[in-house]
Amino acid sequence: MNEQYSALRSNVSMLGKVLGETIKDALGENILDRVETIRKLSKSSRAGNEANRQELLTTLQNLSNDELLPVARAFSQFLNLANTAEQYHSISPQGEAASNPEVIARTLRKLKDQPNLDEATIKNAVESLSLELVLTAHPTEITRRTLIHKMGEVNACLKQLDNKEIADYERNQLMRRLRQLIAQSWHTDEIRKNRPSPVDEAKWGFAVVENSLWEGVPNYLRELNEQLEEHLGYKLPVDFVPVRFTSWMGGDRDGNPNVTADVTRHVLLLSRWKATDLFLKDIQVLISELSMVDATPELLALVGEEGASEPYRYLMKSLRSRLMATQAWLEARLKGEKLPKPAGLLTQNEQLWEPLYACYQSLQACGMGIIANGELLDTLRRVKCFGVPLVRIDIRQESTRHTEALGELTRYLGIGDYESWSEADKQAFLIRELNSKRPLLPRQWEPSDDTREVLETCQVIAEAPLGSIAAYVISMAKTPSDVLAVHLLLKEAGISFAMPVAPLFETLDDLNNADAVMTQLLNIDWYRGFIQGKQMVMIGYSDSAKDAGVMAASWAQYQAQDALIKTCEKAGIELTLFHGRGGSIGRGGAPAHAALLSQPPGSLKGGLRVTEQGEMIRFKYGLPEVTISSLSLYTGAILEANLLPPPEPKNSWRHIMDELSVISCDLYRGYVRENKDFVPYFRSATPEQELGKLPLGSRPAKRRPTGGVESLRAIPWIFAWTQNRLMLPAWLGAGTALQKVVEDGKQSELEAMCRDWPFFSTRLGMLEMVFSKADLWLAEYYDQRLVKKALWPLGEELRNLLAEDIKVVLAIANDSHLMADLPWIAESIQLRNVYTDPLNVLQAELLHRSRLAEEQGKDPDPRVEQALMVTIAGVAAGMRNTG
């Protein structure tokens, strides 16, 4: 066991040593000694030494304002380096995931061993694989892009240092490079000065494509193909690419007034520009490689006499010219110039595919398969995965914005107020207009700014090249009219094809009602005819957990999916469930494999569509090798879930879940909504108010500027509780409900559910993960430094609940300690705690100083404010998630 981690630990300590040298060079021996003392005290405090724990608190409380920032930065940067070492370890020869392509091999072996599955069935399941990853900017990646880039280089150095064969002088050069990179990071401000704009966020997404996915996706497909050949004797067709990427950056306007129609238009152009740029580099390589002369008569006919001497190069050069002309036109459009479209402007993937595929077929036919299956095949696969748009965009808007727009229109037309109509009247009006051949919008109408924005967004969708917009997502969808309203607005903008419109059900009531809403829609003749047998529905994880607590929310999500699957199956509709999961447990995050196998049977038949959020994008797709690993995990899980679906839960299990759901939701809401002390306690015990100052994402933290917990977005709500280590949204109510069911004599039933039902065992596993990141003494310390004494009893009550919850979960799982079955994660959390603890203590101290200055009417000390921001970023790195 320790053998496996010794490589990780030695890398972590080596990087820590280099960081120490950097700090000493920059700030002198005294600061380094101070940091080292704090680290040793923290380590000893973690090992249970109470005297050292007290000394740690005293030392951090007594830091001068000048010492605050260097100490905070030292621990924060160390955690970034530890995360980098861990990410490298996951793909290194010593790491557990060295075998990640092995995941696919393991899955294929497991499937072949099933007596009821033949190879043809497995092959069909492979051919219907579909994985769409939707990159979102929230909760925002807290680490700056420039530092991410440096950490990527540190990773590359670790990889080369792992090679035992390298000469001493090369090793010395690599160590010098590591020192340079760590010094560069130390002398770079880790906190952004300004909030990123939606366009900046989109560029961050494009950088992930360029630096990692562009190389990672073809390599993943190569790996998948090799495993399929070996285990099934089956080769992937050239045009088969089961993975696609979509983005919300620049398209998600829900609660973000900064994402306008103009911004979306700009991001669509920028995305196409980036695609031409990346394909030009590919084509340049192909021009240099494809110098061959032999070609089929078909290819020679295509190039004519002029290209006969080097037919492949000739075709590639003409494709290069088209790419360059397209890029120049896009560049002019981005600068605001109106130019006529050039002949041969690339707007569809086929225009890229055809010349490349013609070369591929000719090379294969002329016995040059080895060449065809090199760079050329990679480029063909990139055309299928990324294509002309690079990433497609989802548009997301809140349902009330569409209702308000139609209300304004009907009032102008003098036919009443749509907003105040009953649901039946709204539906009758919408269906009548959807069936009508005449336009609804009067030319002379001057709508309000908000309504104009909604209409212009639909206009942008109508103008965009076919295939560049993936779906229109309606957040806070509650009724059939919410869906029909969007279809009508799109029709009025001139969109004639069946653009996927996905209602997002995200509160407990809406999830419970989702099946009824979709059943009503599918009973409408116009609707059934229009959607052509396909429906997408999005399931909201974060808002439902914030609304009802994690246990009730996860059961409502399961039941909603289960009912929708059955309804669509009966109606002959192909359903795609779109999962709006976050990286953190309170927002539905779970290790991919476990999460997918815990869904209802049949939930992945229409493929997997899932959001990949801000900081998780870097952990899962930050490097090409990590991308291969993540995509392989998803592939294995989807195949397994479709061919060996989890069992239907027994009725008695469903009853127990209903019971757990009611008890946990009552307890959760009893605190969060009904306890008058809760909101003041939350505001003072966590850095919730200070988080708003962090220039994180382009989106405001609240849907409405005033208001309590209910108006706070799910992300800052979870981020705040993660910072003070109480992790409350991810467990409150769950353990109490389990305890009650145990007291009712059902422990053996719970143990059976844990053993035989992936949904339930994943829930408990996620609770264990949260418990191992939560910390009772730190949460108590925040109370002592920041909370009025009158509110201390509430904090104590919550911590007692947490301690009880941990005992209950361990009893049901039959374990003596947390994460017993995932030692690798337990090890990783332990490793980071030594560095995260001082940041937490320091953060509480900084919050205390900052709030005291505010109470005394003094200006905040910039050193305190800056150090506070650094601790927030550092704790996020230590917890491996923001919100």
From Swiss-Prot:
Transmembrane segments: none
Catalytic activity of the protein: oxaloacetate + phosphate = phosphoenolpyruvate + hydrogencarbonate
GO biological process: carbon fixation; oxaloacetate metabolic process; tricarboxylic acid cycle
GO cellular component, one term: cytosol
Active-site residues per Swiss-Prot or TrEMBL entry: 138, 546
Enzyme Commission number(s) of this protein: 4.1.1.31
PROSITE patterns, A to Z: PEPCASE_1 (PS00781), PEPCASE_2 (PS00393)
Cofactor(s) listed: Mg(2+)
Record's keyword terms, sorted: Carbon dioxide fixation, Lyase, Magnesium
Enzyme class: lyase
Function: Forms oxaloacetate, a four-carbon dicarboxylic acid source for the tricarboxylic acid cycle.
HAMAP family referenced in this protein's UniProt entry, alphabetically: PEPcase_type1
Family to which this protein belongs: Belongs to the PEPCase type 1 family.
UniProt protein name: Phosphoenolpyruvate carboxylase
Organism: Citrobacter koseri (strain ATCC BAA-895 / CDC 4225-83 / SGSC4696)
Gene: ppc
